[in-house]
Amino acid sequence: MQRPITRRNFLGRCGRSLSICASSTLFPLGTVSRSARSAAIEKGFIGHKRSPYFKPLDNQMIRCTLCPHACEVGPSERGLCGVRENIKGQYYSLVYANPCAVQIDPIEKKPFYHVLPASRAFSLATAGCNFDCKFCQNWEISQAQPDDTYNYRLSPEQVISSALQYKSEVIASTYVEPVTFIEYMLEIGRFAKSQPLLKVMHSNGFINEQPLEDLCDVLDAACIDLKGFTEDFYRTMTGGSLAPVLNTLKILKSRQVHTEIVNLMVPGKNDDLQKVRAMCQWIHTELGPDIPLHFSRFYPRYKLKSIPPTPVSTLEKAREVAEDEGLRFVYVGNVPEHPGGHTYCPHCEKMLIRRIGYRIKVQGLNDGKCQNCGRVIAGIWKSH
């Protein structure tokens, strides 16, 4: 068995300048003594990087052009995400090379089911988010500012070298909304181009077109949360809106970025099967039948602790609706050992990938094709 990575040996291998994440839930890779921890971390370290995504206004005001919130920000103030600041009429990212969470995950945890099965994803996040989802699972860092978290100093070059050192095939921007640290993502992606590493993100898709086009230049795959299918749900449950997310999905398709969709089903909020059907019809029409769709089980957390977990039967009914609408790769997520977590050939129905938790067995797939009937299966099955 491979020895697990601890915080101490990670820091030792990656360089003494790294610091450590405040949230143990995102870095459960071992323990470290208090004295070592105090030497390893730095609270509130802010990595300034001028952003190209803003428009100057009068009186040193600026308008952010990164996401549809279009924040107008005065001098020494920050945008809604809390990680971008107007410094004398220029807009700066405060989280460049400054992640507060670093972990090596199975790629299926993102979740990506059609990208290098059983591969290792070097995963990272900074503080901040441009949504305030009432059901957020990582709210301790997504709703924090970089002043409040314990952070690494981890340059894009160090990200690449660390990912390779730990035999990762993928670098994943995840846990919070990676759009808020886009400058960091872009640089990591550019360095990764010359290495045998895929670059992926798990995003809410709430981003303007030009920044998204820039990301498409460096992304291999994107997992997008389609959190609901009404503007009312987005407004009341996330603080965002639906239309920009749908536009993001269409742009990703046009740019041929492999995309998977996650729909977290919250009881009484977005689990109406008629709306699920409308969503699946839109996906089929606009994105095609082969896009993987994950119906994920909700568990009580953050501001929705009084709502019970999603009944498994609800997820199963949603999966039936999606398949009835012609979607070919529909999954039940957050339900360990559920048969809806396996991948089947849509032509001959043979099982191609068996998933029991994070134990993955590729048993009927060869070079991206079903071994039984030869049907091409959408996805990324080889690294660069």
Protein language model annotation of sequence segments:
Residues R153-S313, A318-V321:
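Conserved AdoMet/S-adenosylmethionine-binding subsite of the radical SAM
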